[in-house]
Amino acid sequence: MSTEAEPRVLREVVLSQLATGESRAYKMWLPPLTDPTPVNELVERDYQRRPLRFGLGIMDEPRRHRQEVWGVDVSAAGGNIAVGGAPQTGKSTFLQTLVVSAAATHTPRQVQFYCVDLGGGGLMYLEDLPHVGGVATRAEPDRVNRVVAEVKAVLRAREQVFKQYRVGSIASYREMRDDPSNPASQDPFGDVFLVIDGWPAFVAEFPDLEPAVQDIAGQGLAYGVHVIITTPRWTELKSRVRDYLGTKIEFRLGDVNETQIDRITREIPANRPGRAVSLEKHHLMMGVPRLDGVHSADNIVEAISSAVQQIAGRHTDQAPQVRVLPERIYLHQLDPNPPGPDSDYRTRWQVPLGVRESDLTVAYNQMHLTPHLLIFGAPKSGKTRIAHAVAQAICKRNSPQQVRFMLADYRSGLLDAVPQSHLLDAGAINRNSATLEEAIKALAVNLKKRLPPPDLTTAQLRARSWWSGPDVVLLVDDWHMVTAAAGMVSPMAPLGPLLPAAADIGLHVIVTCQMSMAHRATMDKFVGAAYGAGSPTLFLSGEKNDFPSRDIIVKKRPPGQAFLVGPDGKEVIQAAYVDPPEEEVFSPPSEGS
């Protein structure tokens, strides 16, 4: 039997030798973008990685025969991001990837995220990241307001810091924050991101917040404050906001003619979530928010939870959390150390009303300048409790020689609101129209004597030296009941001509009224005069049609929450509260008595 090898042709010899070589032929055609890349691989493969650049996906560049990590550098003009795409194309997952990528490469001191989730709830899975200061959903309207207010407060505070320390750019400010000896290092906020998933729903449900977001988008980049917005249609994003969003990412659109980038978006395959097009007109496959190396969106909730735990384990610091308005704020919490009767007039008549939603500081009524207060609200909205709190605050600041009260209290809702020592000696408590009318006439006669003579100097007017005696507070609970019982002539008519001079003669008017009667009350000669003079007005819970107005937001609110309109502007507050007096319980007489 022959052992000689069968002869081989030259081709076979060459091919066998080439197959064992280390060099391979150049691959002109790279694999299609089908599977998403996890964040941990995006971070490892991103050769452009640097501070404030987030690796977000894989970009296909067919002309250069390359597929490399695509990301966004938020330190530059593209620091605001708009994401467009039809439902179920991967927009919310993209936001998750962005936040996880940023958290994987930055500390909670460097970047913070404040999220409004009006999409499918995907951002809530990121709430435990130390880089996330808060996530608000459509079921938490007060929290949504606070998220936007918190970010806007950061912007306003940073504007003041830039002015104070003459900071020329946000790049310089970042360096200042990194210097422990610099006062800017005390700023707990780094680059702050307001993330809104579902812009059309945001505008529809929170129309009053749209100008605030526009303001942040327009001014924020210069101060390290960013906006990221998703929308299913570009037409939903009005130009006054869209033009401020320098980076645009486009997933598959419902109507490709709406593209903001290029008709190349029509080439994005259907039913392929995560596929998108960048401003560079390159196809992208966005990553997935996981750190386990799996190229899939399967079991993504568990993967996100694991990634959050892994990142949280690396850090001990935490992004400042969103603070929310308390459901109830007691007067003693709001005003723990009120100024006493020895204080000057201006200080004594700076009366706390509640806590501002914008920055959680105390809102005051400067009653030395704007001597009146109007309170409108639906039943059980807190009108009378607020009147109690304001009356108590005034009494704590002023002695009986400095202030006296007259009450119109048809419903006996003001029991114990004012101590006996601070009531007028005569006509102080009025529970029907007859006694109120007589008391008002007597009060008007006395107050007319305080009207300033025409020859007073400016100094005398300021000091109110031409009369002496206590200021008088007319506290009217349930104005609608007073007017209904009065008939044709209001019992307040004698005081009407005195209201323009109220600050000069020491007259203060506090009125509560049903929201359904608010519009009518502001047309009244008495309450309307106070309202028209710019008196601070609280609009508590009510129906929108109770007080039709473009400028005033009337809606259903929790008890004590109000829309405050005053000389300093408009804002939401949680008004001060005091407990109602304890009711005496009378036991039935015993059988033997």
UniProtKB/Swiss-Prot annotation:
Coiled coil ranges: none
Species name: Mycolicibacterium smegmatis (strain MKD8) (Mycobacterium smegmatis)
Main location: cytoplasm
PANTHER family assigned: SPORULATION PROTEIN RELATED, TYPE VII SECRETION SYSTEM PROTEIN ESSC
NCBIfam families: T7SS_EccC_b (TIGR03925)
Compartment(s): Cytoplasm
FtsK domain boundaries: 66-260, 350-546
GO terms assigned for molecular function: ATP binding; ATP hydrolysis activity; DNA binding
Note: DNA conjugation in M.smegmatis is unidirectional with distinct donor and recipient strains; mc(2)155 is a donor strain while MKD8 is a recipient strain. Mutations in a donor strain that alter DNA transfer do not always alter DNA transfer in a recipient strain.
Assembly with partners or alone: Part of the ESX-1 / type VII secretion system (T7SS), which is composed of cytosolic and membrane components. The ESX-1 membrane complex is composed of EccB1, EccCa1, EccCb1, EccD1 and EccE1.
Knockout-associated phenotype: Loss of DNA conjugation when disrupted in recipient strain, strain does not secrete EsxB.
Keywords: ATP-binding, Cytoplasm, Nucleotide-binding, Repeat, Transport
Superkingdom field: Bacteria
SMART domains for this protein: AAA (SM00382)
Pfam family, one: FtsK_SpoIIIE
Functional summary from the UniProt entry: Part of the ESX-1 / type VII specialized secretion system (T7SS), which exports several proteins including EsxA and EsxB. Plays a role in DNA conjugation, in both donor and recipient strains.
Protein name (Swiss-Prot/TrEMBL): ESX-1 secretion system protein EccCb1
